[in-house]
Amino acid sequence: MHIQTLWPQAIVVYPQGLNTPTPHDPAGTRSGWQARAGDLGDRDLRLFDAIVATMRRSYGVDRRRIYATGFSNGAVFSMLLWARRPQTIAAIGEVAGRLDPAETLTTARALVAIAGRSDTVAPFVVQKQTIELARQVNGASGPGLPCGLHCRLYPSANGPVPVKTFVHPRGHVYPLWASTKIVSFLRSHAQP
């Protein structure tokens, strides 16, 4: 992701997920993140809480500027953080993610979502459902505004909580340009 290179003033934490059963790895032989509250004893939500507490205590981070980003399962966890820790998260930058159907969003937060139309791991139709839910919660209705190649911006009627999408033609990939777009978006959003 190299966010620290693009935003050297930020404190960036890259935690490593533990082995986690997923639909694509039922045995849980690869690292990942919990997708819904209650999974895995909430180990990942508890880890997030501990990271935030440590960062606040040790580095005096700006409480209004805590963000979540991720790719694939990490994006799913970022969406879970929006659902379960909206008081902590200012905005989300996710690539090839979705919100687990057992979860719901109740608090508006700015979102930049990057999705591939040919994604067979996180099917585009499922990613699109999550984007639509985010737009609904954020009050970002309407057709949106073009904002560049593959880009659409959905301004919010509820304040500075837009939904911005980049929908590219490829599959389940982290595009080379994704981190640049995510950092640009996150830098301009803080909690109200």
Regions found by a protein language model. Give the residues of each.
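Alpha-helical scaffolding within the catalytic cores
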Residues: 1-2, 95-103, 146-156
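Short alpha-helix in the alpha/beta-hydrolase fold that links the catalytic acid
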Residues: 123-136, 145-154
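Acidic catalytic loop of the alpha/beta-hydrolase fold
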Residues: 118-122, 172-173
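Stable alpha-helical elements in mature extracytoplasmic
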Residues: 44-51, 73-81, 85-88, 126-130, ...
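Serine-hydrolase catalytic machinery in alpha/beta-hydrolase-like enzymes
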Residues: 1-67, 80, 84, 165
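Primarily recognizes the serine-hydrolase "nucleophile elbow" in alpha/beta-hydrolase
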Residues: 57, 64-109
